[in-house]
């Protein structure tokens, strides 16, 4: 009888300790995951045209039909040599179009899509905006939101939608601006 009572007490203590540990570790894991959403690359001495790059990977993969694989697009903000202005680009990691420009729908916190013109690089995989009023407006909007939806329609294919978790963006943007202004 006393053994049974002792086992029950020990089990209750173990359960309380487990609950306590989960209360402590879950916020730490959430903070760590928000930190790992963003990666900043300081490329000042690399010889690259891009001085610094802040990037975030999409929440889910998309199909790359050319290579029969799944890929995760990357949203990046960057500055170039000799200019503190910040530009936006999305590396779709798959072919989008052979045209020089494309339209991309940006949905901020569940509102309607706003369609913006983006340039495409020579590979047809990376869409980008030069530092302009639109880039600055978008960056300011990104600071206020947690989730970004982006839609693009590859040449002769149905639209592709990707989502980016922008948690922690504002603080990482400040780090990027600091590197770009040096």
Where do the model's predicted regions map?
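Bacterial N-terminal signal peptides that target proteins for export
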Residues: 8-18
């Amino acid at each position: 009888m006393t053994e049974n009572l002792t086992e029950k007490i020990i089990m209750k203590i173990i359960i309380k300790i487990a609950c306590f540990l989960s209360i402590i570790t879950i916020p730490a894991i959430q903070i760590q995951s928000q930190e790992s959403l963003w990666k900043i690359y300081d490329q000042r001495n690399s010889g690259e045209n891009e001085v610094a790059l802040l990037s975030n990977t999409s929440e889910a993969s998309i199909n790359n039909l050319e290579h029969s694989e799944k890929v995760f697009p990357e949203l990046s903000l960057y500055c170039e040599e000799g200019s503190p202005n910040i530009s936006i680009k999305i590396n779709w990691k798959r072919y989008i179009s052979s045209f020089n420009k494309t339209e991309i729908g940006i949905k901020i916190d569940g509102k309607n899509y706003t369609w913006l013109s983006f340039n495409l690089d020579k590979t047809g995989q990376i869409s980008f905006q030069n530092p302009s009023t639109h880039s600055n407006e978008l960056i300011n909007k990104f600071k206020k939101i947690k989730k970004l939806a982006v839609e693009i329609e590859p040449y002769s294919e149905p639209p592709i939608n990707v989502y980016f978790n922008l948690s922690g963006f504002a603080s990482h943007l400040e780090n990027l601006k600091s590197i770009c202004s040096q």
